[in-house]
Amino acid sequence: MAFSRGQAGWALDLGTTNSGVACWDESLGRPRLVELPAVCRKLETSDPLEAPRLVPSVVHFLEKPGVVDRLGNWPPLARRFFLGQRALIGRPALERNEGVSHPAFVPTFKPALSGEALRPLARVGRESVTARDAANAFLRELLREIKKVSGQRVRDLVVTSPVAAFETYRAEVQQALRHLGVRRVRFVDEPVAAALGYGISLDHPRTVLVVDVGGGTMHVVLVRLSPKDAAAGEAAVLAKRGLPLGGNAVDGWVLNELCREMGHDLDADDDEVSRIWRRLMLAEACRVKEAVYFEQDVAFLMSPPGQTFRMETRPGGGTVRLDRERLRGILDQQGFYRSLAHSVEGVLEQAGLTAADVEDVLLVGGSTLLPGFFSFFEERFERRRVRAWQPFEAVAYGAACFAADRMDTLDFIV
């Protein structure tokens, strides 16, 4: 992707699990995700449903920063130059902590920014690392990668914001970005960005249900979008429900089910080796869960410690496999769709509306790809009202439209 001088429409969808950087591509008349090959999720695939261009929202602080690294954090220089490096972010940070999680690793920081910005999340030597420190380091290294790829320093940026976010969250993000030389920071509510990203015309008021299920949470928000509010990047919240239920919980359920089949008790041991193996097996459970989004069934390629890799001695022999039907059964058994139904019914009841009053249903977040998720909403709201084809990109795309003031140019959506 070519970048024009003074590139307009820079946007950041800062997520709990993954983050996306987008900008408005004037030559194509549409928003584009910015590929940051050094830190993005995957380099070997171009399938958008695997979110290859998103950046994992993780941070690993450098244990022994050099003189230049420390100098680069001095405020007068930080606003003008990216000297040295403070931390690893994205894929390199995950790879650095594969198997063993180091004290300097921060697996997530966004949830703490709203009210606990000074809460310690990691440690570098004898010094604690707070949520604020982690957010600052992540944003700093992300902007540095954008500069490497585009040749430009971002000075004007739109950041997406959850409708439930406190003003303290926005203040923390704004302060961090201004410290890094971003002169103009604007925010857009995630429902507004999702609507724009899915190509919804906001030339008249409409009632929209936004369902966001990512790695850690399930958010169901019913909003009223109007031209005036949308122009300010705001959505009128009619009702909302949130649960600490997302892809991470599903990974644990999958692992428990497959270990049960292998005859392994995950809770039997709690030593360091067992904890390391559990982290590795959770990562493998996540892999097979995501793989069955695209394949009918997938082999689980890791065995518990002390058991043979192929599990040939297990009754029935062969490898342990996961298929879509089995994953759907696990979700039903654990009450995933029951919780989703209660959330949807709850926001409708709270707002005094019915399913027929909802004009659009927007699905965002990687866990909306779970088997049965789309059909759940299709049965309740009809296929024509459900938009689900770009769960990873929609919010970032919409933020780029807002940043470039192209809210009335939505014919790039197919």
Model regions and ranges:
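Helical "lid/coupling" subdomains associated with nucleotide-phosphate turnover
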Residues: 137, 258-263, 294-413
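Phosphate-binding loop and its immediate beta->loop->alpha context
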Residues: 34-180, 252-301
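Active-site nucleophile and cofactor-binding loops and adjacent substrate-binding regions
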Residues: 47-50, 186-192, 244-245, 387-397
